[in-house]
């Protein structure tokens, strides 16, 4: 699979991980020792929400975010594949509401 650099802007600092278009961002982060918030792991809640600040992701598996939230660049990291090098601000659940 094509490899991408995913930059995670977390409350604890900026972390760079390697991702690819077949692995969800949340899984890639965990595989590389970075704990991000999650609950359902199925794209059906908002615990893992982040904001895509740069780049693109495919989160067609998600069922929670509405069009307005998607247009505001919100992302559910548990069901998002990177489709380019990207930067995601994590821990954004409270900003959804």
From Swiss-Prot:
Key words, A-Z: 2Fe-2S, Chloroplast, Electron transport, Iron, Iron-sulfur, Metal-binding, Plastid, Transport
Signal peptide: none
Record-linked InterPro entries: 2Fe-2S_ferredoxin-like_sf (IPR036010), 2Fe-2S_ferredoxin-type (IPR001041), 2Fe2S_fd_BS (IPR006058), Beta-grasp_dom_sf (IPR012675), Fd_pln (IPR010241)
Stored SUPFAM superfamilies: 2Fe-2S ferredoxin-like (SSF54292)
Residues in 2Fe-2S ferredoxin-type domain copies: 4-94
PROSITE patterns tied to this protein: 2FE2S_FER_1 (PS00197), 2FE2S_FER_2 (PS51085)
Any GO molecular function: 2 iron, 2 sulfur cluster binding
Record function comment: Ferredoxins are iron-sulfur proteins that transfer electrons in a wide variety of metabolic reactions.
Protein name: Ferredoxin
Source organism per UniProt: Palmaria palmata (Dulse)
């Amino acid at each position: 699979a094509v490899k991408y650099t995913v930059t995670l802007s977390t409350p604890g600092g900026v972390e760079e991980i390697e991702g690819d278009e077949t692995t969800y961002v949340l899984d890639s982060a965990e595989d590389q020792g970075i704990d991000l918030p999650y609950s359902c792991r199925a794209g059906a809640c908002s615990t893992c929400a982040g904001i895509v600040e740069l780049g693109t992701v495919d989160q067609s598996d998600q069922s929670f975010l509405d069009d307005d939230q998607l247009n505001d660049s919100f992302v559910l990291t548990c069901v998002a594949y990177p489709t380019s090098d990207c930067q995601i601000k994590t821990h954004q659940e409270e900003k959804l509401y």
